[in-house]
Amino acid sequence: MIEVARLLKNEVDIRFLIIGEGKKKETLIKMTKEYGLSSCCFFTWQDRDTLPYSLAAADVGVVTLNDETAQVSVPSKTYNLLAVGAPLLCIAPKCSELAYLVSHYDNGTCFDKSEVRLMADYILTLKNNMELQKRLSDNSCNAAKDFTYQNAQNYV
């Protein structure tokens, strides 16, 4: 996403909030400094009482999935983003479960990690098309209803 932020550097009203303490955090911070990006803000890990507010503040939720686990998993943060009605920008293989979820619920778009320009264009499209953003947001909220704790109990 830092490369996407770099392409959108002149869009003064677009911010990238990066939450967590993953092993790539220091590299990402270094990249933002090298590129002179003031649009990227880093937040530490957040507890479950705080996190929903941060996620709900976003106009787009980003979910990444590596190639090795693409066929068998969906990152858990996906469900938190659905619950707050975030349109999704997913970086994952087109054949992944995550790509299927986004396609099935029509609540975002899935990109290959090399499609940096397309990701930037998608963000600009959502910024400039509030009707589309609202539709995707509503679809995320509707999708969240299928992924409740109670529904999960039906499969355990």
Regions found by a protein language model. Name each.
Residues 46, 76, 114, 147:
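Residue-level signal for the nucleotide or nucleotide-sugar donor/cofactor binding architecture
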Residues 12-20, 25-50:
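Nucleotide-activated donor-binding/catalytic signature segment of Leloir-type glycosyltransferases, i.e.
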Residues 58:
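An anion/phosphate-binding loop that grips the pyrophosphate of nucleotide cofactors and donors
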Residues 1-13:
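Short hydrophobic signal-anchor/transmembrane segments that target glycosyltransferases
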